[in-house]
Design a protein with these regions (language model features):
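Hydrophobic core segments of transmembrane alpha-helices in multi-pass, intramembrane catalytic enzymes
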Residues: 86-89, 165-168, 221-229
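Active-site-flanking alpha-helical
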Residues: 180-189, 252-253
Length: 262
């Protein structure tokens, strides 16, 4: 045995001089890989939602055409089912993308539970943002909630679909959107040339695009909330934190609109 090999062996047995171990680079999709997979994941979410409506049309034995899809999809219970079915489709696509990289699903998405201090800080910041937009809306004489959402939620309440809508908008939608935006997109883009600030801004912009059913005013509000969620994702290294914040925001909006006012 050579002196160098003998020295290395002695170091490996010495607790004061542990052997040097190279840490493998994390297996992460970078900018373009994350972007392309992001499109695929969004498409999977869309297919899951549309597939749910097609299934309901088929069960009702209606012709599977645009008119039937619009008619069935306009019902509150059907829409709630559609939004809910987007979640498993999203999770499956994200799991596949991460699996190909042979990375840990939990580590890749930072599925770690935050501390109560982080949860409180995130909630207080979210409340301040929402209250600021609410105050601005009232000063401008604007509605605090888009009219079509108010009509949908109240219709769901009257048609006994309140709990389905509550689950869809307060659980399924926040999980789907956060796994895509602050989970998969943020993780890959923050490890690319965009770094953390660019990843927060770009993922927030794309999350805003998902809400194009709103007007520019409400889109600006969505974008500002997205920036806060992105910052909290970075600050806490916890996707569960942004999922909970997103769920609380939607839950409050749904309950206030559906039962306590317009």
């Amino acid at each position: 045995m050579s002196l160098s090999n003998e020295s290395a062996l002695m170091d490996s047995l010495n607790p004061d001089h542990p052997p040097l171990i190279e840490t493998p680079a994390p297996r992460v999709w970078k900018f373009w890989g994350t972007a392309l997979w992001g499109i695929a994941i969004f498409a999977a979410m869309f297919v899951g939602q549309i597939g749910a409506i097609v299934y309901l049309v088929w069960v009702a034995r209606d012709p599977i055409d645009l008119a039937s899809l619009q008619h069935v999809g306009g019902e509150p219970a059907s829409l709630a089912f559609s939004v809910t079915m987007g979640l498993p489709a999203t999770l499956a696509a994200v799991w596949l993308a991460i699996r190909i990289k042979k990375a840990s699903f939990v580590d890749y998405l930072a599925l770690y539970w935050p501390s109560w201090k982080q949860l409180l800080f995130g909630a207080v910041g979210l409340i301040l943002i929402v209250v600021a937009w609410e105050t601005m809306s009232r000063s401008l004489g604007r509605e605090a909630t888009p009219g079509f959402m108010t009509d949908l939620l109240k219709s769901g309440r009257d048609k006994d679909a309140a709990l389905m809508l509550l689950f869809a908008f307060s659980v399924a939608a926040p999980m789907s959107e956060e796994v895509l935006a602050r989970g998969f997109l943020y993780r890959g883009w923050s490890a690319s040339f965009l770094r953390v600030p660019g990843a927060i801004i770009l993922s927030s912009l794309l999350w805003t695009v998902v809400h194009l059913q709103y007007d520019l005013y409400f889109l600006a509000e969505v974008f500002s909330i997205g920036l806060w969620f992105g910052y909290m994702r970075y600050r806490s290294n916890s996707l569960w934190l942004t999922i909970v914040l997103h769920a609380l925001n939607n839950l409050t909006a749904v309950v206030l609109t559906m039962w306590l006012g317009s």
